[in-house]
A protein has these predicted regions:
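Hinge/lid segment of periplasmic solute-binding proteins
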Residues: 1-24, 39-42, 53, 156-160
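Glycine-centered hinge/linker elements that transmit conformational signals in sensory
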Residues: 89-119
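Paired acidic/hydrophobic, glycine-rich loop segments that form the ligand-binding mouth/hinge
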Residues: 135-140, 155
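Extracytoplasmic/periplasmic substrate-recognition and gating elements
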Residues: 148-209, 257
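Long, aromatic- and glycine/proline-rich binding clefts that accommodate carbohydrate-like moieties
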Residues: 157, 205-261
Length: 287
């Protein structure tokens, strides 16, 4: 579903979905197992016992709280940018009650897991995970190739929900192969687009590090079960499509400012009011 929505505009399909990026959680299969919620993750952290076998593990959970994309799943479910097809610049709705609740729960991850926004960078966390020093981490699907090549035994699961009554839904970004209607040879252009998006789709991850948007492939990881990779398309299909109109980055920037503010101690109400005011100001300017 997400692939078709990303490749369409006003009901017309404009491109061939080639690959996608979205946040997921990875876990170290040698020392950990699947989780569905951050409450489960907290229980693991609170009751973690260091043994001779796991002595090299430095942290149970860490992630980069600074970027909009990796942090969208926690709160983004409670606002709709661009309408049902993510293309209407005048459309913006927000579920204030659940949005604020999600922001509050999100900010609590800082103290629950001792995460520093300045030092917990994506690269640092990736290095720790690939060295068996970190049990759980939020990554982009674009990071899976590096993890797979590291030799660590890992699993892939959806981003956990923050607490009962809240959902975590990732944002996805789809890369398309688009045929220019004014090209001198439409047939050749379509053949190339099909080759990239379909015929050679199984080679995309090994060559580029991106995950193919073709859903019927059996994904393969050297150090993860194929079922973990195949599950990616189920998550992707129901993901939030990044809005595709010019200027929408203004809203995403406001969102990133919001998560920085609450992470750094600003009250949820004040951060929300500033966010909402900024979005409304932008929407007023384009109406």
């Amino acid at each position: 579903k997400a692939a078709i929505r990303s490749a369409s505009y006003k009901g017309k399909l404009y491109g061939y979905p080639v690959s996608f990026s979205m946040p997921v959680m990875v876990y170290n299969k040698q020392y950990a197992s699947t989780v569905e919620s951050y409450e489960q993750l907290k229980q693991i952290s609170d009751n973690y016992v260091v043994t001779e076998e796991n002595a090299g593990v430095a942290k149970v959970f860490d992630f980069d709280p600074s970027g909009m994309f990796l942090n969208y799943p926690y709160i983004g479910r409670y606002m709709n940018i661009g309408g049902d097809e993510a293309e209407d610049a005048a459309s913006f709705t927000i579920d204030e009650q659940h949005f604020k609740q999600a922001v509050k729960e999100y900010a609590q991850l800082k103290d629950t897991f001792g995460i520093d926004r300045q030092s917990s960078t994506l690269d640092e966390c990736l290095d720790e995970f690939t060295q068996n020093k970190l049990l759980y981490k939020i990554v982009s699907t674009d990071n899976l190739k590096k993890i797979d090549e590291s030799g660590v035994s890992y699993g892939i699961i959806p981003v956990p929900y923050l607490s009962e009554g809240l959902e975590s839904v990732p944002m996805s970004v789809t890369t398309l192969a688009i045929v220019n209607p004014y090209t001198s040879n439409i047939a050749v252009a379509k053949t190339v687009a099909r080759a990239i998006s379909y015929d050679y789709a199984e080679d995309i991850q090994s060559l580029s590090g991106h995950t193919s948007a073709r859903a019927d492939l059996t994904k393969k990881g050297k150090n993860a079960d194929n079922t973990d990779y195949n599950m990616l398309h189920d998550i992707y299909s129901d993901s939030i499509v990044k809005a595709k109109y010019v200027g929408v980055q203004n809203i995403y920037t406001q969102y990133e400012i919001l998560i920085h503010q609450v992470w750094d101690g600003k009250s949820v109400d004040d951060a929300y009011n500033e966010f909402h005011k900024g979005v409304e100001s932008y929407l007023t300017s384009i109406r």
